[in-house]
């Protein structure tokens, strides 16, 4: 999936979750903001509008996503945004240069979360704010379980370092943040649907385009693949809400924390 419309689908898929993140930003004029795992830049551009004349830096590991982000940012005429290709775990941020660090599902894939959040903490000024959305544990996310069940034995576990639910344990994640230099991490339960398309055909095309789904189907013979696709269609049909399209249940954490003062 590489066209602009397919890249932008991720924003539509998560629009219900995004409203919770937006309400927690607290970004004001003059703030310096870091957007971690910024993707195509929806959150970055939104932060830029609230922070102006402050600057916003969006970081992502995908050059393709960043190219789309730059296109959309230029189209909106936002001059206070910069995008950087890099992994926030090891990226060389200017120390103590940001007031707020935000991320919408962009912090779950670090190979070393302790090092990553320590690096992010170092980029924040003392008492700077961290605002994240991360998925809760797999058993609370039907949007993945339903697809895996339809794929059956062909469903594949994520490779090491690619687990979207790696921060789903609130107690373990709180300890990571505290070790990294953050105080008072708070976890708000966000219970919203993942939106997979305006109708059944669109939803099936989207799900078949996922890397994990296409890889699973590629491991099956033609008859097995056809059966798996039919099970996917049936599963998605059972979640067609008409008003919002195909919607599957999910749970995530809205996490807020504050960078510890150096003299604390």
Task: Say what each PLM segment does.
Residues 32-36, 40-91, 115:
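Class I SAM-dependent methyltransferase SAM/SAH-binding core
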Residues 180, 204-205, 252-264:
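Core SAM-dependent methyltransferase catalytic element
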Residues 89-100:
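A short acidic, Gly/Pro-enriched loop at the edge of an enzyme's catalytic core
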Residues 1-31, 42-46, 50, 65-68, ...:
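Conserved class I S-adenosyl-L-methionine
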Residues 1-9, 184-244:
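C-terminal helical/coil "lid" or tail adjacent to the Rossmann-like core of SAM-dependent
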Residues 114-115, 125, 129-198, 214-219:
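Conserved catalytic/acceptor-binding region of the Class I
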Residues 51, 110-111, 124-126:
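Helix-to-beta-strand junctions that scaffold the AdoMet/dcAdoMet cofactor pocket
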